[in-house]
Amino acid sequence: MDDSKIVAGKVKKPGKRGRKPAKIDLKAKLERSRQSARECRARKKLRYQYLEELVSSKERAICALREELDMYKQWCLAMDQGKIPSEIKALLTGDEQKTPQSCSNKTTKNSKYSSSSGI
């Protein structure tokens, strides 16, 4: 034979390796590509919506913590002036006896802040 090789009873011609693409339906390929792009855009939109919701929830949490910090600062300023805020009086008096579970959380939270602040 000339340049052909015989492998497992088949005659192979030298040249390109691998699969030879069959006649590709260009319209079908283009439609698959468009569908894939639509799905990609939809996934991207959902991801951005999720991230925006996450950011807004974190911003709300930050605002709540800032308000709580301002409240504690006001309490400290009042105690520096010799006044005891009514909220602290309520914590120190009967409220702890009425609801020990909820106040114990508040008490540990307050003690955590007062021990860590150098005021």
UniProtKB/Swiss-Prot annotation:
One of its GO terms (biological process) is positive regulation of D-glucose import. CDD domains: bZIP_CREBL2. Residues 1-23, 95-119 are annotated as: Disordered. The keyword DNA-binding applies. Residues 62-69 are annotated as: Leucine-zipper. One of its GO terms (molecular function) is DNA binding. Pfam families: bZIP_2 (PF07716). It is found in: Nucleus. Residues 10-21 have a biased composition (Basic residues). Keywords: Activator, Differentiation, DNA-binding, Nucleus, Transcription, Transcription regulation. Belongs to the bZIP family. ATF subfamily. This is cAMP-responsive element-binding protein-like 2. It comes from Danio rerio. The gene is crebl2.
